[in-house]
């Protein structure tokens, strides 16, 4: 008793001195301070920078900075919380600190009284609830700590609504919580066996135990509050694991086996009974109760969120509603804060496809079933997500060990990004709403005796909010309950493997997906990408309300395929958006890259993961220690690894499509094939040559027999009179035999009754989508052939397919775009692809012995219908440029007669013809560049530079070009805030006029295009070849003026004036080319020489032909000229060779240069633009 009085006296003294704590440690420090009144002159510990570098710190108060920080220009900070010191060896609590033990017992008794009172109150609430089920707050009293098995932590059952602690729970909120499901058990069933090698609880460690510790208001533990689907719970099959292993169910898939495409229906929301279910032993819960039939969506209708959402703070509600639109997105829905672990793409994030999943029966009956409380996931995707947390929140102070099989079930999270974050600005204030609750939950008692290799999360990131005490987990504390800690291996593909897994883990995700929410992805795509080129050939309403309504319930053997396909479609779309986002200077398209060591001396990231603070410090170190070339190579390697990962994952599932072709829904097939279009779009967008992706895509499309839909007659969607929801069937209930089943070997039909996942849908309603997808792949095939000069892989003509398959009725369910104005821009980009397809199919080098210009003339006449009087988009202007280029090539090559070996006479009419073609070509080039400069010079997604929203389905805009410039459109454009200080000034500077074409072209403002880099390369090539021609023609005109009459002199003067204007335009083109930077990831040098890979030609031929510098190589023989000469000499007419070898006359030197330029332009068309 005297000792207790002494303690009280010391405590009061320490309080007077400014102390705020009555803990024994503070008492000892206060007693020691009384004996040593002398103030310290040196820091009692090293500053954070010196401790990080593990060097001696000489910090003093009078200087305020240590010598090391002063030398590096840093400031000394002591923000890091000191770690608790562990006991020394041979330490005995009973003999060493008897007084401290008594105080600890006293505090523990007070804690027990607090928990007993709270438990009694909760038990009374349970008795009042009656048959309504177990409330999530009804927690059994703390068991005897000596020989009992620890139940899941108490914080697991406490609702985490905005981080409200148990003591601040509002009784009114609890009264509004829905009752539990009928038939659930009301009482706990304690596990009948103990887990061996599990640390027993003790009274002394009670307050440090997370399972009985109260929550701080500023601390929110992200526990998984949703019951894990049994399909996503994999079990270990090791025979030696007799007692089972305590593992977590940290998957982010839906609780009812459905994707979170449902807008958090009441049954899928984490109600109180789901919280109670989460903590029960799976062996004591029947499978029907753990996955009730009520979780099925009846009709796929979205339901209201749970009433608990009303209890959230007002500020938190506003943040959640910023990016949340009222869409009936089936899977691409914004996750509610109560349901973070219902993320729609979590099951197959980085673990590949597994045909074997845990069955419902085996999980309910297995005595070694895992505990149903969650633990920390070790998936690098989730670990990277843990680094971003809102202010006022802290991560748990523990890291749980996982079994190898459970680690494969971790999932990416869905994080709603603010506008600044999406623009590439680092969000240092923590404005990101982290909607994942399954990543950081777990139990500090989670161990496994059979774990051979285990990975823990990095040291927790301290919170930066004012008023909260930052805390960190200690390595020594973790070692006390972690069986074995091993640093994971990092290989070239950045993977983490588990030796104890029943199935080896596949390569981990290269970048952390889930940083952009599902709703934001779809909105961003249709706002910035779809108008430039339709990757998903469907309007937004049908995509979100019909196509993405995919059932992943375990009612068939293809639910894994559905989940897997949609996951990697979503990840590929996020990869495109993140690459296309406008980045800040020095920023990267990836933020949470996993597994890359940021600094050789960085010891804080031993597991290979990065945190937000570590990234900030390491970014500065990287800029100081790495040059620009190394940073570029790093970004390129990460991008290639991420692209290859998405491509490999989506290809791996193809055998399952072949096996279950009759059962897979057409919706999944459309999404699956759209993923290949998406990956080819990414390659074209960054200008990267990867023919393997295109070749495999063509193979997959041919496996689905999509070419039959284009080759064989079938009624178009415009000709289908019945509604789309009706089935056009024959008498036996099957579809028409004239329609081909996608993926079958021949024409056939589908029986809806044999396809439980097809939702009784007739595949004929999706045939137009498959046709569109095939046309889109053919466009990318043509683009790659034009850009890199390779042969075309798809030789089926798509001429006229734009009008047949894409420009259907706007009121149709399957229309491409619901706005007529936006649809016109989409169709123009498709016509550009159609034109490139026809040009590559009719190449001279690919079509035997044909005269140069024969196919060019035919193509120009056939495709002239694409050119309108007022071009509205870059794609349409580029179509006009390509046709003008081929006409110009034909005009130049006609100056020389290869049969007779003579040049034509350069008359005034011929000179006028050449000048008109040249001036027209240069004028179109300037229009293309100025329009690109005004609309999107960087070809990036900038949320501060959004495209205007035209009125949807306005009948006044469908009549003609004059009606399109009506007042509604002009009013909408004028209402949009201008991003430039004076738009009219810049338009006048660029030579643009305020006419109908200019107004309509603004609809493409901010839109990205896959043709941007290819267009810039081609424009540069043409400009470099023809920029000296106006000067040559002017010289010829001035020379010929002396021998002409008055009328011809007036005509020649007009030509000279026109050519002078063209020279001025060439200067403008040269300056504008330096202002357009559409390059992403890979830097393209427009004037970089490319070595010829043609076997029979010299390596220097291609250099001078394609990129002549300062007039070099104007007389060099072109590749196509050499090829055609060889074909002509190998024929049966060798008599023309001596005539062609005659020395040209001096007066024909200019004509010879013009013909040489024509051949080089032909080389550019035949051998590629890059």
UniProtKB/Swiss-Prot annotation:
Residues 1-47, 77-149, 226-254, 269-288, 293-323, 384-506, 944-977 are annotated as: Disordered. Residues 473-488 have a biased composition (Basic residues). It comes from the Eukaryota. One of its GO terms (cellular component) is nucleus. The modification Phosphoserine is found at residues 202, 205, 208, 229, 283-284, 410, 414, 1130. Disulfide bonds: none annotated. Keywords: Activator, Cytoplasm, DNA-binding, Metal-binding, Nucleus, Phosphoprotein, Repressor, Transcription, Transcription regulation, Zinc. Belongs to the EDS1/RGT1 family. This is Glucose transport transcription regulator RGT1. It comes from Saccharomyces cerevisiae (strain JAY291).
């Amino acid at each position: 008793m005297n000792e207790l009085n002494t303690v009280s006296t010391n405590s009061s003294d320490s309080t007077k001195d400014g102390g705020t704590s009555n803990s024994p440690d503070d008492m000892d420090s206060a007693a020691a301070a009384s004996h040593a009144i002398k103030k310290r002159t040196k820091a009692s510990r090293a500053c954070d920078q010196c401790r990080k570098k593990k060097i001696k710190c000489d910090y003093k108060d009078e200087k305020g900075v240590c010598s090391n920080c002063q030398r590096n220009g840093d400031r000394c900070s002591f923000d890091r919380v000191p770690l608790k010191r562990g006991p020394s060896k041979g330490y005995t609590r009973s003999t060493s600190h008897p007084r401290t033990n008594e105080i600890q017992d006293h505090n523990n008794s007070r804690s027990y009284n607090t928990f007993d009172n709270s438990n009694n109150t909760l038990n009374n609430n349970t008795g009042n609830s009656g048959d309504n089920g177990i409330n999530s707050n009804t927690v059994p009293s703390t068991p005897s700590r000596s020989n009992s098995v620890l139940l899941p932590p108490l914080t697991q059952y406490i609702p985490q609504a905005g981080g409200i602690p148990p003591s601040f729970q509002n009784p009114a909120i609890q009264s509004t919580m829905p009752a539990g499901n009928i038939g659930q058990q009301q009482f706990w069933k304690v596990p009948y066996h103990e887990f061996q090698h599990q640390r027993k609880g003790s009274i002394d460690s009670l307050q440090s135990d997370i399972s009985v510790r109260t929550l701080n208001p500023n601390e929110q533990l992200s526990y998984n509050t949703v019951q894990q689907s049994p399909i996503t719970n994999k079990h270990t099959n090791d025979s030696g694991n007799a007692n089972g292993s305590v593992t977590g169910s940290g998957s982010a898939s839906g609780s009812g086996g459905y994707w979170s495409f449902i807008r958090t229906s009441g049954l899928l929301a984490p109600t109180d009974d789901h919280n109670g279910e989460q903590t029960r032993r799976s062996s004591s819960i029947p499978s029907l109760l753990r996955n009730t039939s009520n979780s099925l969506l009846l009709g796929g209708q979205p339901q209201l969120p749970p009433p608990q959402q009303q209890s959230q703070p007002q500020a938190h509600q506003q943040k959640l509603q910023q990016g949340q639109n009222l869409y009936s997105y089936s899977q691409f829905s914004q996750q509610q804060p109560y349901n973070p672990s219902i993320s729609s793409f979590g099951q197959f994030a980085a673990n590949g496809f597994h045909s074997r999943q845990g069955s419902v029966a085996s999980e309910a009956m297995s005595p070694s079933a895992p505990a149903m409380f969650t633990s920390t996931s070790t998936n690098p995707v989730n670990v990277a997500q843990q680094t971003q947390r809102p202010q006022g929140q802290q991560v748990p102070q523990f890291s749980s060990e996982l079994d190898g099989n459970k680690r494969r079930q971790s999932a990416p999270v869905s994080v709603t990004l603010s506008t600044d974050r999406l623009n590439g600005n680092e969000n240092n204030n923590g404005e990101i709403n982290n909607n994942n609750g399954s990543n950081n939950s777990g139990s500090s008692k989670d161990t496994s005796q059979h774990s051979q290799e285990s990975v823990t999360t990095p040291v927790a990131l301290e919170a930066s909010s004012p008023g909260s005490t930052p805390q960190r987990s200690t390595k020594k504390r973790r070692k006390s309950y972690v069986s074995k800690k091993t640093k994971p291996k990092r290989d070239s593909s950045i993977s983490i493997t588990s030796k104890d897994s029943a199935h080896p883990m596949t390569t981990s995700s290269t970048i952390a997906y889930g940083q952009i929410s599902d709703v934001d992805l779809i909105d961003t795509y249709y706002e910035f990408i779809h108008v430039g080129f339709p990757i998903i050939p469907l309007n937004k309403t049908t995509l979100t309300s019909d196509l993405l309504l995919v059932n992943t319930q375990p009612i068939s053997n293809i639910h894994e395929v559905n989940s897997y396909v949609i996951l990697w479609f979503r990840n590929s779309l996020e990869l495109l958006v993140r690459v296309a986002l406008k980045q800040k200077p020095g920023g990267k398209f990836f933020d949470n890259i996993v597994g890359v060591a940021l600094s050789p001396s960085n010891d804080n990231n031993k597991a290979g993961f990065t945190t937000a603070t570590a990234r900030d410090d390491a970014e500065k170190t990287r800029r100081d220690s790495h040059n620009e070339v190394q940073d570029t190579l790093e970004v390129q390697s990460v991008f290639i690894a991420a692209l290859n990962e998405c491509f490999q994952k989506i290809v791996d599932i193809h055998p399952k499509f072949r096996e279950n072709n009759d059962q897979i829904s057409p919706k999944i097939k459309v999404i699956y094939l759209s993923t290949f279009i998406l990956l080819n779009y990414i390659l074209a967008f960054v200008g990267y040559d990867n023919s393997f992706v295109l070749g495999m895509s063509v193979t997959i499309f041919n496996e689905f027999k999509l070419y039959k839909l284009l080759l064989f007659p079938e009624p178009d969607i415009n000709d289908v009179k019945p509604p789309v929801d009706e089935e056009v069937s024959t008498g036996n209930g099957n579809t028409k035999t004239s329609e081909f089943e996608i993926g079958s070997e021949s024409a056939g039909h589908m029986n809806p009754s044999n396809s439980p996942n097809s939702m009784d849908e007739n595949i004929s309603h999706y045939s137009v989508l498959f046709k569109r997808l095939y046309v889109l792949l053919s466009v990318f095939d043509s683009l790659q052939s034009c850009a890199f000069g390779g042969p075309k892989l798809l030789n089926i003509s798509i001429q006229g397919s734009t009008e047949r398959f894409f420009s259907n009725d706007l009121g149709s369910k399957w229309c491409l775009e619901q706005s007529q104005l936006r649809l016109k821009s989409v169709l123009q980009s498709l016509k550009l692809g159609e034109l490139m397809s026809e040009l590559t199919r009719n190449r001279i080098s690919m079509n035997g012995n044909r005269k140069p210009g024969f196919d060019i003339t035919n193509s120009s006449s056939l495709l002239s219908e694409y050119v309108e009087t007022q071009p509205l988009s870059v794609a349409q202007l580029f179509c006009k440029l390509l046709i003008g280029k081929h006409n110009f090539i034909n005009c130049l090559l006609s100056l020389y007669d290869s049969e007779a070996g003579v040049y034509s006479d350069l008359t005034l009419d011929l000179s006028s013809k050449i000048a008109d073609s040249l001036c027209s070509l240069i004028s179109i080039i300037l229009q293309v560049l100025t329009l690109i400069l005004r609309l999107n010079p960087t070809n990036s997604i900038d949320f501060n530079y959004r495209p205007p929203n035209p009125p949807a389905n306005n009948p006044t805009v469908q009549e003609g070009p004059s009606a399109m410039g009506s007042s509604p459109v002009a009013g909408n454009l004028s209402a949009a805030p201008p991003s430039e200080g004076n738009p009219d000034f810049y338009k006048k500077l660029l030579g643009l006029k305020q006419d109908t074409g200019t107004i309509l072209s603004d609809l493409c403002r901010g839109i990205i295009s896959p043709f941007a880099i290819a267009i810039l390369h081609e424009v540069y090539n043409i400009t470099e070849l023809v920029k000296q021609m106006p000067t040559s023609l002017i010289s010829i005109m001035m020379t010929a003026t002396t021998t002409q009459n008055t009328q011809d002199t007036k005509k020649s003067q007009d030509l000279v004036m026109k050519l002078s204007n063209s020279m001025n335009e060439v200067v403008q083109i040269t300056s504008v080319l330096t202002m357009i930077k559409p390059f992403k990831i890979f830097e393209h040098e427009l004037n970089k020489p490319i070595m010829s890979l043609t076997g029979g030609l010299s390596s220097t031929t291609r250099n001078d032909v394609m990129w002549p510098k300062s007039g070099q190589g104007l007389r060099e023989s072109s590749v196509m000229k050499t090829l055609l000469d060889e074909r002509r000499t190998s024929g049966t007419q060798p008599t023309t060779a001596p005539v062609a070898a005659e020395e040209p006359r001096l007066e024909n030197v200019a004509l010879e240069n013009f013909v040489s330029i024509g051949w080089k332009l032909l080389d550019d068309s035949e051998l590629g633009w890059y």
